[in-house]
């Protein structure tokens, strides 16, 4: 087996290093898995990840978000809780963020190079500004809004 030393491999190594430096396990693990896949016989499965990866990731994320409800850690509020202005605002923000993320998916497909910029921006925000990684889908949705794609 010979290593493929190409631009994509270099980018994945850089993302891996930035992920480690910024303590961002999602970036670190993703870059490591893709680098291993690219450099081994697993490369034939990359088109499957490309086709279904975002959908599978969203399903896993949704399971993670809903699991506290199922486990009982989070209780549903009573009717008066749903009628408060804070609940109405939180629902509205949730709708806006979901809509933005939905607009980000096509942009990521149309211009995948922008994903690299979004990831680098996220890593910089985490490493130097004390931010937390909120997800490239939402960032891509905001970018789509700024680029006039919406």
UniProtKB/Swiss-Prot annotation:
Query: In which compartments does the protein localize?
Result: Cell membrane
The answer, when asked if Ribonucleoprotein is one of the entry's keywords, is no
**What are the transmembrane regions?**
1-21, 52-72, 81-101, 123-143
The domain of life for this entry's organism is Bacteria
Any matching Pfam family:
DUF441
Sorted alphabetically, the Gene Ontology cellular component annotations on this record are: plasma membrane
PANTHER family, from UniProt? UPF0756 MEMBRANE PROTEIN YEAL
Q: What family, per the record?
A: Belongs to the UPF0756 family.
Q: HAMAP family recorded for this chain?
A: UPF0756 (MF_01874)
Which protein is depicted? UPF0756 membrane protein CGSHiGG_08995
This chain's source organism reads Haemophilus influenzae (strain PittGG)
């Amino acid at each position: 087996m010979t290593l493929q030393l190409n631009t994509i491999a270099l980018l994945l190594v850089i993302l891996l290093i930035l992920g480690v430096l910024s303590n961002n396990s999602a970036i670190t693990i993703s870059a490591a898995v893709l680098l291993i896949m690219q450099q081994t016989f697993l490369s034939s499965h990359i088109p499957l990840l490309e086709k279904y990866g975002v959908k599978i990731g969203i399903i896993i994320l949704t399971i993670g978000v809903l699991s506290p409800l199922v486990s009982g850690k989070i209780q549903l509020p009573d009717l008066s809780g749903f009628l408060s202005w804070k609940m109405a605002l939180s629902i509205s923000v949730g709708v806006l963020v979901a809509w933005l993320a939905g607009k980000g998916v096509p942009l990521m497909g149309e211009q995948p190079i922008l994903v690299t910029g979004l990831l680098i921006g996220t890593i910089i925000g985490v490493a130097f500004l004390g931010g937390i990684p909120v997800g490239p889908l939402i960032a891509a949705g905001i970018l789509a809004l700024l680029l006039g794609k919406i």
